[in-house]
């Protein structure tokens, strides 16, 4: 999305947020009205307005200075995240107040209908709002408020290890027990804590897998974003190699370039960075992984996604691959698997993807698995199988736009391939 789109969307959000302020302010007045200290009441009420309006003004000022050549910086993402946090908190607070006010409306209407001939001249139609309603509103709104703040300060670097064993009837015997570490969606332009990123890399290194793969979106927009972290991500090594592909953000499509030549040079620089990192970038091509005299094919395509750039050419990538070979495909967007790969004439045993981030927000427990991204992507995180073809969608290593994660934590995937009996 370009600068104009960001400005329109977030100015609308900011305007609605400001309109909510008067309602929340009114609710807070009810909450503090019995306090003996007038000074403390003023601190709470005007402190709220100062924070709410201040964050909105800072964000709008940041958007107005947003560079079309760089896109959103960590500062812009922080301001956006604070604005979203306050916006959702105010909505939750206002909804609780609204429920109480609707009750007041019905009570007032009923009281008027029954006692209209007995009403005093200056008797108010609405009964006064009870302090209890404001107290409930504060308690309920505190849940998302503290949750989002946790996601911004800690959750976005709270790396989780997801280990899965995948079974295949036709896995070559030599690859029985073969391990793969996958990370995806690094989005290096959003990072703001090198030490925290290093902890994630150390966790990935500690797995000592046979193969390492990265499934796209090294940067948000421009090749220079990864440069401060080259020394860190180059630490990821594996005995059978490190392989990578491009994601939709790697092409630089979301910021302005002075010329096509400049944009092309940026992409070439990004490809060079993959080489410097020690990653073999697969651009609609394949390689053979050999172990114990047996082989499997690792295939990588450029980005192909529903509603996104569709540069990936699976037919080209499959050229030279033995039709009977065991095949693993790296494809950034899981919609490629949904629309093309699972129906492909030649069986591709396993596809590894990312892209969705799991929306960076959701719930994953033993009995409940939900994220708003499920309404956009059928396969938004984890494992899926259909027609004997398996898919794994990584939840992402980094974050984008919202500078945080809540419930859907950054992921490092370790897959163990096992041969199952026919």
Predicted segments — roles?
Residues 1-156, 422:
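Non-catalytic terminal accessory segments
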Residues 3, 7, 54-57, 61, ...:
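Amphipathic, alpha-helical segments enriched in basic
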Residues 28-38, 126-139, 163-172, 200-212, ...:
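Short, charge-rich amphipathic segments
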Residues 110, 143-181, 194-195, 202:
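C-terminal segment of N-terminal export signals and the immediately downstream linker at the start
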Residues 127, 133-137, 141-167, 265-283:
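A short, flexible N-terminal coil/short beta segment enriched in small residues
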Residues 170-422:
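Soluble catalytic domains of enzymes that build or remodel membrane lipids, polysaccharides, and related
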């Amino acid at each position: 999305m370009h600068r104009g789109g960001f400005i329109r969307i977030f100015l609308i959000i900011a305007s609605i947020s400001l309109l909510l302020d008067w309602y929340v302010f009114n609710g807070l007045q009810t909450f503090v009205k019995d306090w003996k200290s007038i000074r403390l009441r003023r601190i709470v009420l005007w402190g709220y307005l100062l924070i709410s309006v201040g964050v909105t003004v800072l964000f709008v000022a940041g958007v107005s200075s947003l560079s079309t050549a760089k896109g959103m910086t960590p500062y812009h993402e922080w301001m956006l995240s604070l604005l979203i946090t306050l916006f959702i908190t105010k909505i939750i607070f206002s909804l609780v107040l609204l429920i109480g006010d609707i009750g007041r409306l019905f009570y007032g209407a009923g009281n008027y209908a029954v006692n209209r001939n007995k009403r005093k001249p200056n008797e108010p139609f609405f009964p006064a709002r009870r302090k209890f309603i404001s107290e409930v509103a504060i308690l309920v709104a505190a849940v998302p408020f503290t949750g989002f703040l946790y996601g911004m300060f800690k959750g976005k670097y709270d790396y989780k290890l997801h280990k899965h064993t995948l079974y295949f009837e036709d896995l070559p015997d030599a690859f029985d027990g073969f391990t793969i570490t996958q990370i995806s969606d690094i989005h290096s332009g959003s990072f703001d804590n090198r030490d925290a990123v290093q902890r994630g890399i150390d966790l990935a290194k500690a797995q000592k897998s046979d193969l390492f793969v990265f499934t796209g979106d090294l940067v948000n927009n421009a090749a220079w974003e990864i440069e401060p972290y080259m020394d860190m991500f180059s630490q990821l090594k594996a005995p059978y190699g490190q392989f990578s592909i491009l994601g939709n953000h790697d092409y630089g499509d979301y910021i302005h370039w002075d010329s096509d030549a400049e944009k092309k040079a940026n992409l070439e620089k990004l490809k060079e960075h993959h080489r410097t990192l020690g990653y073999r970038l697969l651009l609609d091509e394949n390689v053979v992984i050999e172990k114990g005299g047996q082989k499997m094919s690792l295939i990588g395509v450029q980005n192909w996604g529903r509603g996104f750039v569709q540069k990936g050419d699976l037919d080209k990538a499959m050229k030279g691959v033995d039709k009977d070979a065991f095949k693993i495909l790296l494809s950034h967007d899981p919609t490629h698997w949904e629309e093309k790969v699972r129906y492909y004439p030649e069986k591709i045993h396993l596809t590894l993807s990312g892209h969705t981030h799991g929306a960076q927000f959701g719930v994953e427990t033993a009995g409940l698995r939900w994220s708003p991204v499920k309404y956009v992507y059928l396969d938004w995180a984890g494992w899926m199988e259909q027609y004997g073809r398996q898919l794994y969608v990584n939840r992402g290593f980094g974050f984008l736009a919202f500078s945080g994660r809540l419930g859907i934590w950054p992921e490092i995937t370790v897959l163990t391939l096992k041969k199952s009996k026919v």
